[in-house]
Amino acid sequence: MAENQYYGTGRRKSSAARVFIKPGNGKIVINQRSLEQYFGRETARMVVRQPLELVDMVEKLDLYITVKGGGISGQAGAIRHGITRALMEYDESLRSELRKAGFVTRDARQVERKKVGLRKARRRPQFSKR
């Protein structure tokens, strides 16, 4: 691709994103589609842009992203995590600012498994006294 590109892997729930950053004019490509085409939901787009807006690099970098697995919010979170890691590789001085905003830490929450004898992970069947 480019001679001076930076890479970051992001994960969230069951999604994994590979993010490549290079100097450019703010173009974001996710799985060969634009950000607006890929995420119909405005909140997901905002989540993806958060780290770039924080460090004021929205118009300075081009992003090429591939993401697999999970749903919309999981993929958006994985992309945000990947962008954060790639930005830290690009400029280590951004780490403290990104850490304060909480983007550096991987959100380790996973779906709790369904248990035998229960309807869902914790939901019990209705109890009848008589």
Swiss-Prot record:
One of its GO terms (molecular function) is tRNA binding. Keywords: Ribonucleoprotein, Ribosomal protein, RNA-binding, tRNA-binding. One of its GO terms (cellular component) is cytoplasm. It holds the Pfam family Ribosomal_S9. SUPFAM superfamilies: Ribosomal protein S5 domain 2-like. One of its GO terms (biological process) is cytoplasmic translation. Transmembrane segments: none annotated. The C-terminal tail plays a role in the affinity of the 30S P site for different tRNAs. Mutations that decrease this affinity are suppressed in the 70S ribosome. Part of the 30S ribosomal subunit. Contacts 16S rRNA. Cross-links to the P site tRNA and weakly to the A site tRNA. Belongs to the universal ribosomal protein uS9 family. NCBIfam families: PRK00132.1. This is Small ribosomal subunit protein uS9. It comes from Escherichia coli (strain K12).
